[in-house]
Amino acid sequence: MKVHIVAVGKLKNGYVAEGVKDYYERIKHYIPITMVETKQENPFNMTTKEGFHIVLDAQGKLMTSEEFASFIEDLLTTQSNDVYFYIGGPEGFSEAFKNNAQMRISLSLMTFPHELARLFFLEQLYRALTIIKGEKYHK
């Protein structure tokens, strides 16, 4: 299984891009991962792409870091197909796009710029992996 991060839009803020790169490099030590930036909402046709598709969405399921770690651990142990996480741009995703996903998750009840959402998600994915491994990053 490989994890794919599919993000709409390019990162424009240097400090955000540095943070995203840092967490991406850290995550690569734990799991196979790719990250793709795209201009369009539907970079992969979810109906023809095998895998488990998850959209980050403000109305998605809220989880604590520990619950997210448990969710990721379940995916890693039970999912043979690739897992896709979709992070929207400034306009988010259409309902039609979101309805094609198997799951929606939310990072917070608060609203963030899409660039920061990407950074926050990668940090949470890294945190989840360290929780799974019993490492001391999460306190």
Curated annotation (Swiss-Prot):
Gene Ontology MF annotations: rRNA (pseudouridine-N3-)-methyltransferase activity
Domain of life of the organism encoding this protein: Bacteria
Pfam families: SPOUT_MTase
Binding site for S-adenosyl-L-methionine: L56, G88, L107, S108, L109, M110, T111, F112
GO cellular component annotations of the record: cytoplasm
UniProt subcellular location: Cytoplasm
UniProt keyword list: Cytoplasm, Methyltransferase, rRNA processing, S-adenosyl-L-methionine, Transferase
Record's catalysed reaction(s): pseudouridine(1915) in 23S rRNA + S-adenosyl-L-methionine = N(3)-methylpseudouridine(1915) in 23S rRNA + S-adenosyl-L-homocysteine + H(+)
EC annotation from Swiss-Prot or TrEMBL: 2.1.1.177
Main location as per UniProt: cytoplasm
Function: Specifically methylates the pseudouridine at position 1915 (m3Psi1915) in 23S rRNA.
UniProt subunit comment: Homodimer.
Name under which the protein is recorded: Ribosomal RNA large subunit methyltransferase H
Organism: Coprothermobacter proteolyticus (strain ATCC 35245 / DSM 5265 / OCM 4 / BT)
The organism's taxonomic lineage, starting at the top: Bacteria, Pseudomonadati, Coprothermobacterota, Coprothermobacteria, Coprothermobacterales
Gene behind this protein: rlmH
